[in-house]
Curated annotation (Swiss-Prot):
Listed InterPro entries: LS, LS/RS, LS/RS_sf
Cellular component aspect of the GO annotation: cytosol; riboflavin synthase complex
GO biological process terms held by the UniProt record: riboflavin biosynthetic process
EC number(s) on file: 2.5.1.78
Family under the similarity heading: Belongs to the DMRL synthase family.
Keywords tagged on the record: Riboflavin biosynthesis, Transferase
Gene Ontology MF terms in the entry: 6,7-dimethyl-8-ribityllumazine synthase activity
HAMAP family: Lumazine_synth (MF_00178)
Amino-acid positions noted as binding (2S)-2-hydroxy-3-oxobutyl phosphate in the UniProt annotation, renumbered to this chain: G89, T90, R131
UniProt protein name: 6,7-dimethyl-8-ribityllumazine synthase
Record text on subunit structure and interactions: Forms an icosahedral capsid composed of 60 subunits, arranged as a dodecamer of pentamers.
Highest taxon, organism lineage: Bacteria
One family name in Pfam for this protein: DMRL_synthase
Length: 158
């Protein structure tokens, strides 16, 4: 039996992080968690990490798509999407969270480049804060590790 598993130590990886500016007080922690995981655990060099800011979570799929097209030309091995969508009193949450998730998934499938989903979709600010580095860990760091592992899984499959 042949088992394929990826490792996270990927010193030569080139990784882009697309991050939403909206809810930046939470997203800044996700970004720090992602960068820390890439450098400390993944051993990714600082010069191989690119951060791209977009207005909000709804804009993430388009930016990630552009980054994956760059990846096909030797730009990036993976892209991490970071953001926070917090439920409010209107249907806006469902539209933004759903389109962001669907769009990122489509980009990953179409590009065949790892797109790690680090977008928090929470019921409250408190839940978002918990997932950005307090009680529930840092989902930015988790997304970074997912991206690194998927780089290696896909290399092993090909």
């Amino acid at each position: 039996m042949n088992v394929i598993e990826g490792v996270v130590a990927t010193p030569d990886a080139r990784v882009a992080i697309a991050i939403a500016r909206f809810n930046h007080f939470i997203n800044d922690s996700l970004l720090q968690g992602a960068i820390d995981a890439l450098k400390r655990i993944g051993q990714v060099k600082d010069e191989n990490i690119t951060v791209v800011w977009v207005p909000g979570a709804y804009e993430l799929p388009l930016a990630v798509r552009a980054l994956t097209k760059s990846a096909k030309n030797g730009g990036y091995d993976a892209v991490i999407a970071l953001g926070t969508v917090i439920r409010g009193g209107t249907a806006h949450f469902e539209f933004v969270a759903g389109e962001c998730s669907s769009g990122l998934s489509s980009v990953a499938m179409d590009s065949e480049i790892p797109v790690a989903f680090g977008v928090l979709t929470t019921e409250s600010i408190e839940q978002a804060i918990e997932r950005a580095g307090t009680k529930a860990g840092n989902k930015g760091a988790e997304a970074a590790l997912t991206a690194l592992e998927m780089i290696n899984v896909l290399k092993a499959i090909k």
